[in-house]
Regions:
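Short functional hotspots at interaction and active-site rims
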Residues: 1-129
Length: 129
């Protein structure tokens, strides 16, 4: 997600590993404006720190300190999605879960100003100003 542009990129996948993370970074790379560079904040989940992770040239990874989810703006976004679009539901199968997640993400993108309001931390505002 990009609070400055009030937008984001996501892939809904059924696994979390270095291959999935590399696919996400490749997708994100394609969404970055020409001659721009993205900084991606990440915790140190296993699939974020493997040696075979493919990081495109227009992306830099910044790792947060251990046990500090409050520093990661994406955590507020996930909480919003869970609380407002995915909670109190029963899904018949994996395909239905994937569809619901895609609908939730696309609905979030359609809410003008939502990503900015959830993810614009004061220190991010200072960095992008």
């Amino acid at each position: 997600m990009c609070p400055a542009r009030d937008t984001g990129v996501a892939l809904v996948m059924t696994r979390l590993d270095s291959e999935a993370m590399s696919l996400f970074l490749a997708e994100l790379s394609q969404a970055i404006a020409p001659r721009a560079h993205a900084v991606v904040l990440m915790d140190k989940a296993g699939w974020h720190i493997v040696e075979d992770l493919i990081v495109p040239a227009n992306i830099s990874l910044v790792f947060l300190p251990p046990y500090s989810p409050e520093l990661n703006p994406i955590e507020r976004l996930w909480l919003y999605l869970k609380d407002n679009r995915l909670t109190h539901r029963v899904f018949a199968d994996t395909a239905e879960i994937i569809d619901a997640c895609c609908d939730a993400w696309n609905g979030l993108l359609a809410e003008t100003g939502r990503i900015r309001s959830l993810c614009s931390y004061p220190w991010i505002e200072q960095v992008i100003a």
